[in-house]
Amino acid sequence: MSIKTEEISSLIKKQLANYQDKVSVEETGTVTYVGDGVARADGLDNAMAGELLEFSNGVYGMAQNLESNDVGIVILGDYTGIREGDTVKRTGRIMEVPVGDALLGRVVDSLGRPIDGLGEIKTDKTRPIERKAPGVMERKSVSVPLQTGIKVIDALVPIGRGQRELIIGDRKTGKTAIALDTIINQKNQDVICIYVAIGQKESTVRASVETLRKYGALDYTIVVSASASNPAPMLYIAPYAGAAMGEEFMFNGKDVLIVYDDLSKQADAYRELSLILRRPPGREAYPGDIFYTHSRLLERAARLSDDLGGGSMTALPIIQTQAGDVSAYIPTNVISITDGQIFLDSDEFYAGQRPAIDAGTSVSRVGGDAQIKAMKKVAGTLRLDIASYNELASFAQFGSDLDAATQAKLARGQRTMEVLKQGLHDPLPVEEQVVTLFALSRGFIDKVEIEDVQRYESELAAYMHANHQDLYDTIKKTGKLPEGDDLQNAVAKFSETFQGTKKQVAEEK
């Protein structure tokens, strides 16, 4: 077959037209060790701390240890397919996760990938998981309440938007229940919620998701799950990923509530990583920067200044104690970082006082400024009343011949503790809480038998809704008690008509 001369020149011209002189340069290294969720690689001399690195099988890792002869990498995924001698290349990017409205109602892993079987998440927005916390001048003081719907918290340890309030207690004392109830109570409050489950059983996470779905809270909630079966690096980065998702809303002027459940397991995962990376162990074998690990996370919760949109991110970190020991290393660290703590006591829990919040050791350091005036007025002496009741109750065990004043105090204390009990996933609007505590503080509940207190409370709420909705509306809109004696008269009128169980039984006979 002969080719004409003019065809040869046109073929050469075509080839030259397709020629590109751009050369893609990739900096690659070689894996020298892999195991337990960690790899080491040499040849990555210019890698940055926290940079995303890609292994030859498509799994990503994050540069953690930058040493003179190699780089320590935490592997973000299944490490069983990575072998010594594999190549690993730099991406030039730091670790990012997808953010935005598309994540609402979804369950994702630590990398923002969906794990709920509802298809891919369509968003083109991403944010780095590590970000410097807002500075002093970028913040505003906490002054807007975040209602949890739980009487004992809203009355004694009020939380404000932009606050960090620690929930601490032994296992199985109701820590997660308080966090979920708070999320459920944000319905119609224009608050975006993020629930970060760290190191939990997948069945437990599933139950939490179904609870949120049942009460209609999943529509405004993102669930980030790094379950116990995930490698340690996924547990370590999960809270930072959740914080990045929350910051997207916060910097767009919205209010965010984020729950870290729990940071004890994240600390354990970070300890595991650090020991495998051969970092020097410190107290309880935790690395020296374990305090910084938690402080840089929790400092990202803030109420932003008006110049930055006035958004907020409220953090509820959870810490699990052992045998009620709040003086251990991680609990004391997180207590010192946060703006207060809600301490759950296992003895109270098993005695039937639920939520089992210890009023003596629980405190809110900045939330008092955010508490509405009506609640301040009716709950002013509540903490003191509980403290004196606990003291009298332990003293009364030794003798029965108590004077009338002491007996009256004991009776009021018993009714106070009964009022502060609350059912699971049953948060109350703040106006109902205020009226109940008003009835308690004005002595209307003193005449009610202890077994009838909770029925009195629910019937009072129903009576007020039916006959005095305007009083509820006043409390809700103004944050203050209604002027005059209207509320006093309404509660007094209901109390006259309320019939205790004993009276009902006597009448039936």
From Swiss-Prot:
Catalysis performed (reactions): ATP + H2O + 4 H(+)(in) = ADP + phosphate + 5 H(+)(out)
Stored Pfam families: ATP-synt_ab, ATP-synt_ab_C, ATP-synt_ab_N
Domain of life of the source: Bacteria
Site (Required for activity): 362
Alphabetized UniProt keyword annotations: ATP synthesis, ATP-binding, Cell membrane, CF(1), Hydrogen ion transport, Ion transport, Membrane, Nucleotide-binding, Translocase, Transport
InterPro entries: ATP_synth_asu-like_sf (IPR023366), ATP_synth_asu_C (IPR000793), ATP_synth_asu_C_sf (IPR038376), ATP_synth_F1_a_nt-bd_dom (IPR033732), ATP_synth_F1_asu (IPR005294), ATPase_a/bsu_AS (IPR020003), ATPase_F1/V1/A1_a/bsu_N (IPR004100), ATPase_F1/V1/A1_a/bsu_N_sf (IPR036121)
GO cellular component: plasma membrane; proton-transporting ATP synthase complex
Cellular compartments annotated: Cell membrane
SUPFAM superfamilies assigned: C-terminal domain of alpha and beta subunits of F1 ATP synthase, N-terminal domain of alpha and beta subunits of F1 ATP synthase, P-loop containing nucleoside triphosphate hydrolases
Enzyme class: translocase
EC number of this enzyme: 7.1.2.2
Chief location of this protein within or outside the cell: membrane
Membrane topology, from the record: Peripheral membrane protein
Residues bound to ATP: 169-176
Gene Ontology MF term list: ADP binding; ATP binding; proton-transporting ATP synthase activity, rotational mechanism
Entry keyword Cell membrane: yes
Entry's family note: Belongs to the ATPase alpha/beta chains family.
Subunit structure, as described in the record: F-type ATPases have 2 components, CF(1) - the catalytic core - and CF(0) - the membrane proton channel. CF(1) has five subunits: alpha(3), beta(3), gamma(1), delta(1), epsilon(1). CF(0) has three main subunits: a(1), b(2) and c(9-12). The alpha and beta chains form an alternating ring which encloses part of the gamma chain. CF(1) is attached to CF(0) by a central stalk formed by the gamma and epsilon chains, while a peripheral stalk is formed by the delta and b chains.
Function: Produces ATP from ADP in the presence of a proton gradient across the membrane. The alpha chain is a regulatory subunit.
PANTHER family reported in the protein's UniProt record: ATP SYNTHASE SUBUNIT ALPHA, MITOCHONDRIAL (PTHR48082:SF2)
Name of protein: ATP synthase subunit alpha
Top-level taxonomy: Bacteria, Bacillati, Bacillota, Bacilli, Lactobacillales
Gene: atpA
